[in-house]
């Protein structure tokens, strides 16, 4: 079954256990680096979830920036020597400012983080730190939104098959493996295989 259909089923399953409170909305938080930054939710993602859940039942927030490591979102991150980088969690704070403004006064039925990132960490050789950071980011978001961690959905876009030989990005395959492992670790997590998108074509097929 294509990933798009599996993802659709996953999202429906996620919201099926959500709060049934009247007027409650389903919150989708889209973040990551370049591929997420270039993504235009209004072209496909938002129409799809609105069709499935109702136009007035969905809140979609996107905030992403190309070329960034995960430590610009996950605040406890430390490098292999135990040092803290200068830019730590600043993009997470920027994202959360948007999220809090969007949900102010709203009743929330479900929350799902849609994450497309990992290239920079693979390039820097930080793959061994990525599992803790990925799980930590999910937990950090759940805590800050006062949401049960086990109920917060997590859709992870896996790195494509761009550098399977680890020639330019020494931890490319390691980060891919970590993303798969994390996605398999919880029923509320889902992996999107992006290997078929590494064809050089734009969203217009050119």
Listing of model-derived features with the role each one plays in the protein:
Residues 1-7:
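Bacterial N-terminal signal peptides that target proteins for export
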Residues 21-206:
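Cell-envelope and extracellular/periplasmic
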Residues 11-19:
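Hydrophobic h-region of N-terminal signal peptides that target proteins for export
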Residues 6, 18-21:
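Serine/proline-rich low-complexity intrinsically disordered segments, especially terminal tails, linkers
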């Amino acid at each position: 079954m294509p990933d798009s259909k599996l993802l659709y089923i996953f999202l429906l399953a996620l919201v099926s256990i959500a709060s049934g409170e009247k007027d409650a909305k389903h919150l989708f938080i889209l973040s990551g680096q370049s591929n997420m930054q270039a993504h235009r939710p209004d072209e496909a993602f938002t129409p799809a979830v609105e069709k499935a859940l109702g136009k007035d039942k969905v809140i979609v927030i996107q905030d992403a920036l190309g070329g960034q490591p995960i430590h610009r979102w996950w605040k406890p991150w430390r490098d292999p020597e135990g040092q803290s980088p200068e830019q730590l969690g600043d993009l997470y704070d920027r994202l959360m400012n948007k999220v809090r403004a969007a949900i102010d006064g709203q009743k929330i039925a479900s929350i799902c983080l849609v994450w497309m990132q990992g290239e920079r960490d693979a390039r820097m050789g930080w793959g061994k730190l990525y599992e803790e950071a990925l799980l930590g980011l999910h937990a950090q978001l759940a805590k800050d939104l006062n949401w049960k961690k086990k109920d917060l959905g997590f859709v992870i876009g896996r790195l494509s098959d761009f550098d399977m030989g680890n020639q330019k990005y020494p931890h490319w395959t390691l980060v891919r493996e970590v993303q798969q492992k994390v996605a398999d670790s919880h029923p509320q997590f889902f992996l999107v295989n992006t290997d078929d998108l590494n064809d050089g074509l734009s969203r217009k097929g050119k």
